[in-house]
Amino acid sequence: MSKKYPENSNQIARSRRDFMHQAGKVLGGGAVGLAAGQALALNEQSLVVPDHLDSITAPAVGGGAARDNLPYHDNVWNRDALARIMGDLDFGKQKFGWYRGVVKGIRAGEKVKDLVGFEGFSFTRLQDNGNGTYNKLLREVGFYTDLKTGEVLNEWHNPYTDETVPVVHIANDPFNFVISAFWPKPPSYGGLNTEKIPDIPMILDWTETPNGKVLLQNGIDLFYPSALQPDKWPRESSGKFSRVSEMFSYVFDRESLANPDHTGLEFSGSWHRVTPWLPWMLMGQSEGHVLYNCIQGCYKDMDMMSPKIRAYAEKHHAKFFEAPKKWEEPSWSSLEHYAVEQKPAPVKTSTK
C-alpha cells in the first residue's frame, strides 16, 4: 500500500523544486530538463510515495549482453563513467554537448504534426568535491527553428489556434547537479516524507554489442506540480500538474569506455521528451501534448552544430560557449525561468 500525505500548497511548491533538482542528478539536466532513475506520482489531493522505492531508484542492469570484463556492477566505476559522459574528469576542462530534432504535436483523432525544429548545445565543467561526489556545472541554450529553412524563430503560427505567437527559447544558466555513486533519494516533499531511505548503489543499464560498442539507456516518468499554475497563467499552463517523460540512449566505443585515460567520453544517441504543450504556444488546458524527437551527442568539437544556430548563438548568447567555473544559484528548469522572465498572455475575448 502507498503512503498518502495531505497536500499543503507551500510545501508542494518547495517540493516541486526539490524534486526537479533530485531528478536532474542522473543522466541529464538538459535543456528541457531531466533524466533520472526515479519517478514521482502525485495527484491534486495527495502525495503518493510508492513503497517499492528500489523499483524507482535502481534500474535493471543491461541483461546477458553486458559482459563482466568491465566493472559494470561497481557503483564507483558507474559514478566515474557517468561523470565522463556528462563532463570531463580532467577537472576544469569543459565539454560540448549537442542535440537536434523536431517538436511534434499530438492530439486525439488526427495525424501527428511536425510543429517546429529544435537544436541546442551545452558546455559542462566538473568539480571534484573531495567527498566522492562531483559537481556538474552546465550552461545550455535550445532554439526553436523553422522546419523548412532552419532559421531561428522569433514568432510561430500555431496551426491549432490559427494564431501567431512569440517564441520563447531555452536558456538555462546554470543548470547544476551532483554526481554520486548512489542513486538520488526521493525528496522530502517539503518535510512531508520523513521515511529514511538507505543508500542504493547506482548501477546503470549497460549493454555490450558484438561490434565493440556499448549501449546505455535511461529514462524518467514525472508527474509534479507545475511552475505555471492555470489561475495565473490561463493560456500558458496545461494544468496544475505537469506530466513529462524523457528517454535517452547513448552509444559508446567500448575501447574508450574501458580506458580511464579518456576522461571525457564521446558518444552519439537519441533523446525523446513527452511533455505538455509548450507555454509560449498558448494552448492552455486543451487536449494533447508535444513530443521532442531528437538525436544527441558529445564530441571534441562543435562541427555537428548547424552554421545558422552557431551564428545566432554567437551573436545573441555568446556567454553559453563557456561552462560555469563555480556553483551558482538559482539553478532553474526552463519552466521556472519562464515563470520568472515572462508575463501571462492576455486572455482571448470572444468575438461573438
Descriptions of predicted regions:
Residues 107-252:
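Predominantly extracellular/secreted and cell-surface proteins with exposed
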Residues 13-14, 34-75:
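C-terminal segment of N-terminal export signals and the immediately downstream linker at the start
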Residues 237-273:
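Mature extracytoplasmic/lumenal regions of exported proteins
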Residues 64-131:
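N-terminal targeting and processing segments
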Residues 23-31:
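Sec-dependent signal peptide hydrophobic core
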Residues 60-61, 65, 117, 345-352:
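Targeting-peptide/extracellular-domain and disordered-appendage signature
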Residues 1-18, 22, 40-45:
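N-terminal secretory signal peptides
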Residues 268-352:
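Edge beta-strand at a domain terminus
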